[in-house]
Design a protein with these regions (language model features):
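Hydrophobic/basic alpha-helical segments
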Residues: 1-176
């Protein structure tokens, strides 16, 4: 039985992300707009703006919630949409060349940057969510250690919780 929460849909029984499949399907439908604009003779710069506004925004919606727990197979299916987009815009270029030409990064890297940016905002003292972040090692132990500004690690009993946003970002802050 699927549970719908903030327009994200998770299938509880099989641990499959239905939301990702829906997002990929929705973004794939929007690729038709790019094809029509390409046939109409729009320049690549305008096609990229359309991609950023209509397609990539759909692919990255609420990515902080699901990015760390995303299996490689589903991450690749999201990345495939960007590959198809860049193939439509730049017919003659391979994916890596198209990324270099546009200045884009792979979506996995971009999602990780967005998660890190959100975690940094949450750690700020004026953030309303600051109480969710574990104390820094200096606050927890009172000792001036080498890594005193890093948040303490959250003890996790299950892998599922370990892959959720806050524990995963604390591990990422420690370079693990």
């Amino acid at each position: 039985m699927p549970i719908k929460y903030w327009a994200l849909q998770f299938k509880v029984i099989s641990n499959e992300f239905l939301h990702i499949n829906e997002v990929v399907a929705k973004a794939s439908k929007r690729l038709h707009i790019l094809r029509v604009l390409k046939r109409g003779g729009e320049p690549p710069a305008d096609l990229l703006k359309v991609y950023f506004a209509l397609i990539r925004s759909v692919l990255e919606y609420c990515c902080a919630v699901w990015h760390n727990a995303l299996p490689v197979k589903l991450s690749d299916s999201i990345e495939r949409v960007q590959k198809r987009t860049l193939r439509i815009i730049f017919l003659a270029l391979h994916y890596q060349e198209a990324l270099a030409t546009t200045g884009c990064v792979p979506l996995h890297t971009r999602r990780m940057e967005l998660c890190s940016k959100l975690f940094t905002k949450i750690k700020e003292p004026e953030s309303r969510l600051r109480h969710l972040v574990p104390p820094t090692q200096l606050q927890a132990h009172g000792r001036s250690l080498r890594n005193k500004d890093r948040p303490s690690l959250i003890s996790c009993k299950t892998e599922r919780f370990k892959q959720s946003f806050l524990p995963a970002m604390c591990l990422y802050a420690h370079g693990m």
